């Protein structure tokens, strides 16, 4: 029989998920941060990651539309502003596109997502569907990977700047804002989960939701590693298939 945890015990259980399963542990990220990839492999990462970045405000808008809690809507909508901005040319998606262009990728090609890996698109779609279909508590809990993102951001920025001569601080400007945004968002979401997971079943559902989100992020890197590192099997139509890197 599952025992009801205290809020602090629940937080510890959630953090243990990240310690074991967050994608900073993935071999592809270790290669990326360690300077072991070539430019085309880094381009493939940026192109595929765009699919995830572009889906985040869709996921957040889906969550907002589901709740009758006005406080939750007010606070959560800041995430839309962070990613979409308040006018054209602002927001995290625009900054990610600048990163992609800084790596030499065509902006329209990236936006179209037509050269992304099928597994990337499937994983991203699964995340949006999860937030739409599962309980509101699970939807909020699935965002808690942001508890762990400051660590991976600092590793990524320092490692990529040190190891790749084709990357500059301007290229990686996207991550500057996320160092403040992610902890703010995670603090609110964690407090929400600790207050609303009131039964053992709800607590286990929250832990499972965070586990699922870690799996979504891990699966995207599995696909990148399989296509662009080993065994190097790029699917038809994807970036680099048949030697076409555009």
Curated annotation (Swiss-Prot):
Pathway: Cofactor biosynthesis; pyrroloquinoline quinone biosynthesis. The gene is pqqC. Ring cyclization and eight-electron oxidation of 3a-(2-amino-2-carboxyethyl)-4,5-dioxo-4,5,6,7,8,9-hexahydroquinoline-7,9-dicarboxylic-acid to PQQ. One of its GO terms (biological process) is pyrroloquinoline quinone biosynthetic process. GO terms for molecular function: pyrroloquinoline-quinone synthase activity. Its EC number is 1.3.3.11. The keyword Mitochondrion does not apply. This is Pyrroloquinoline-quinone synthase. It comes from the Bacteria. The keyword Plastid does not apply. Keywords: Oxidoreductase, PQQ biosynthesis. Pfam families: TENA_THI-4 (PF03070). It catalyses: 6-(2-amino-2-carboxyethyl)-7,8-dioxo-1,2,3,4,7,8-hexahydroquinoline-2,4-dicarboxylate + 3 O2 = pyrroloquinoline quinone + 2 H2O2 + 2 H2O + H(+). It is an enzyme of class 1 (oxidoreductase).
């Amino acid at each position: 029989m599952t025992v009801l945890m205290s809020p602090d015990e629940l937080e510890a259980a959630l953090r243990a998920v990240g310690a074991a399963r967050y994608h900073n542990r993935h071999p592809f990220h270790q290669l990326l941060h360690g300077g072991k990839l070539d430019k085309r492999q880094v381009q493939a990462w940026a192109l595929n990651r765009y699919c995830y970045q572009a889906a985040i405000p869709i996921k957040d808008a889906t969550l907002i539309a589901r709740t009758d809690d006005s406080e939750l809507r007010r606070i959560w909508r800041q995430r839309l502003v962070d990613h979409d901005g308040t006018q054209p040319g602002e927001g995290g998606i625009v900054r990610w596109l600048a990163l992609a262009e800084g790596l030499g990728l065509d902006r329209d090609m990236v936006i179209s997502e037509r050269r992304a890996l099928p597994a990337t698109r499937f994983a991203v779609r699964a995340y949006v569907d999860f937030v739409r279909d599962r309980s509101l508590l699970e939807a909020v809990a699935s965002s808690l990977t942001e508890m762990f993102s400051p660590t991976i951001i600092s590793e990524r920025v320092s490692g990529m700047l040190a190891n790749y001569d084709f990357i500059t601080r301007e290229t990686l400007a996207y991550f500057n804002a996320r160092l403040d945004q992610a902890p703010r968002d995670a603090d609110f979401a964690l407090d929400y989960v600790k207050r609303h997971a009131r039964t053992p079943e709800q607590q286990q559902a929250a832990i499972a939701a965070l586990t699922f989100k870690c799996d979504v992020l891990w699966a995207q890197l599995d696909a990148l590693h399989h296509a662009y590192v080993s065994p190097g099997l790029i699917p038809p139509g994807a970036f680099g298939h048949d030697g076409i890197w555009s």
